[in-house]
Curated annotation (Swiss-Prot):
This is Transcription elongation factor GreA. One of its GO terms (molecular function) is RNA polymerase binding. Keywords: Coiled coil, DNA-binding, Transcription, Transcription regulation. GO terms for biological process: DNA-templated transcription elongation; regulation of DNA-templated transcription elongation. It comes from Streptococcus pneumoniae serotype 2 (strain D39 / NCTC 7466).
Amino acid sequence: MAEKTYPMTLEEKEKLEKELEELKLVRRPEVVERIKIARSYGDLSENSEYEAAKDEQAFVEGQISSLETKIRYAEIVNSDAVAQDEVAIGKTVTIQEIGEDEEEVYIIVGSAGADAFAGKVSNESPIGQALIGKKTGDTATIETPVGSYDVKILKVEKTA
């Protein structure tokens, strides 16, 4: 079975690589040191510091594994390869819900770079799926768990 690929910009991949380096060179050694200190407290069966450190170690190792997979199977997307006004990973899109006045701006990213609070939506999200491949002036229907709504694409530009 073919491994899943993770479409992303080169910048997103570089960010993941830095995050992985931080986990391996800083967080992992810190956790190992905390485990060592907690072990020195004696009886491990009632040692909450040891349990907490082991839990954190499992979390950090899970993050490392996840990042390594995303980096290994990264598919670098070149937003210059699509039309200038076409929605793709690496593009900034301004949309407006039909019948509303407010405009919304999103940056389309691969799933590894999604950050809703920063306005970065994944190409796999309902918004991303509805917008990918559309062009300035097109309308799109965004399907959500609570219903659907139509938006007009006002502007598409390369993300700075």
